[in-house]
Each structure stands twice: as structure tokens, then as C-alpha cells.
């Protein structure tokens, strides 16, 4: 399955000057919501991701996503895996588990995002779940921006990666684009970064 073509066909691979939720600036932005607005494609992508996870023979009892960007991807992945789905969300800028969602002690959970850049949001979600006694067994995403190490990828983890190295990250594709710290972004010389993404927007 050509994941890059899926993003291009859905007009979800945007070019410009963007402020990513990780804080980095980039000339490309992946808008997964445009890909996931097609239920059949969302189901197909989730099944592809679930296949990778099932081949790893992991015991997963639940999928959890940080709102809002990860919700559609996480729900479809949970459906493909046949497990329940919950999500965390920010309240006053603090990641929280609410809406009656509960986790059991030692419940084995996969944290799923639509896109993994540094993994910061996924780790905020992880912290909430672990504080409630859950056991995080893996991470998943439709796409990986190449900072974190993905299972089945030759790319190594880069500076800024937040995900723990001892847990697998399953994703369908690496999208490696230039990313810049705000204080050294060459794009800022000619334009202002816009934020089309999820965190704080």
C-alpha cells in the first residue's frame, strides 16, 4: 500500500511554512484528518497497521489516543485489533483521562497517534495511563516523521525523539522532511509559520 500516495491523493500533504505541534518548523505538513475523512480508506489503513502489530504477537487489550488528532486513527486501529478504545484530552493544557474512561491495573495498552513527530503528545498520554496503573506495550501511528525509530525502518532515532527505545513504534511509512528549531528556521526569513494542526488549535 502506497501511504505517500494516499496522502497526496487526499490533498493531505501540504507544502508551505508550518509550525508543528512538536514546536519545530517545516516546509511540509501531513494533515491526516483529510485522509481519515474517507471511512473506507481509514479502515484499510488501520488494517494494514494492525497486521504489523499482530505479526509482532503483542498482547494488546486497549488502544488509547491523545485527542484530538489521534482519535480517528486510534479508533479504527482498535476496531481492526478487536479491542476497546479510549482517549486522553487536554484540560487547561494538562493531558487527562475523563468522560468515565478507566484503565485496569496492568492493562496492556497501545498508544496510537495519526502522526508521530517527536512523540511528545504520545508520552503525555502514556504518563496519564501509567499513573493509573496501565502497562504501555507499544506505540502506533499512520505515519512517522522520522525523528523516532520505527519498527521495520532503517532510520535511527534522531535528536528530540521522546519515545522510549525499548518499546516498538509501528507506523505505515516514514515521511522525512526538513524540520527546524524556531530560532534557526530559514523559512522565517521570508514568511510566518502557520499552525494547521491539533495542539492548542
Swiss-Prot record:
The entry's keywords: Glycosyltransferase, Magnesium, Pyrimidine biosynthesis, Transferase
Any Pfam family the entry gives: Pribosyltran
Residue numbers binding 5-phospho-alpha-D-ribose 1-diphosphate: 113-121
Enzyme class: transferase
Keyword Transferase (UniProt): yes
Binding-site list for orotate: 117, 145
Binding partners and assembly: Homodimer.
NCBIfam families xref list: pyrE_Therm
The name this protein goes by in its record: Orotate phosphoribosyltransferase
